[in-house]
Amino acid sequence: MTTPSVSAISAYRQLLRATRIAFKDDYRVLLAARTEARKQFDQHKRTAVDTPMQIQHALETASILRHNIVQGARDAEKEDAKWELRIHDDIERGDNDSVKIGGKKVKIEKACS
C-alpha cells in the first residue's frame, strides 16, 4: 500500500506533465496552471481525512488536461489568419454521437475541417 505522501508526489508530477502537454508553447497559461497546482498542493500539505480525495482530484484534473484540452493559435501578424488547433496524440477524439456509445471503439471516418 502506498503512503499518501508518495501518492501525492506522483499526482503532483502527473499534473505538471499534463500542464506541459496541454499548454505547450503558451508560457503564460502554463505558468498560471503550474502556480495554481503548487498553491493547491501547498494548502493541503498535512495529511488529513480528505487527502485521498485531494489526490484523486489532482489525478482527474491531470487526465482532463491531457485528454480534453486543445489549444488554438493563429499568426498574430495576420488579421485574417485562421486558427490552428494543436491536437496531440493524447487528445480524445470523437463526435457528439460517439459520446452515447459506451465502451466501444470509435472509428473516425473523416477529418475535422
Curated annotation (Swiss-Prot):
Pfam families per UniProt: Complex1_LYR
Superkingdom of the source species: Eukaryota
Location in or out of the cell: Mitochondrion matrix
Protein name: Mitochondrial zinc maintenance protein 1, mitochondrial
One annotated GO molecular function: protein folding chaperone
Quaternary context: Interacts with RIP1.
Reported function: Assembly factor required for Rieske Fe-S protein RIP1 incorporation into the cytochrome b-c1 (CIII) complex. Functions as a chaperone, binding to this subunit within the mitochondrial matrix and stabilizing it prior to its translocation and insertion into the late CIII dimeric intermediate within the mitochondrial inner membrane. Modulates the mitochondrial matrix zinc pool.
Swiss-Prot/TrEMBL keywords: Chaperone, Mitochondrion, Transit peptide
Protein's UniProt keywords contain Transit peptide: yes
A GO CC annotation given for this chain: mitochondrial matrix
GO annotation, biological process: mitochondrial respiratory chain complex III assembly
CDD domains per the UniProt record, alphabetical: Complex1_LYR_LYRM7 (cd20267)
Stated family: Belongs to the complex I LYR family. MZM1 subfamily.
Gene: MZM1
Main location: mitochondrion
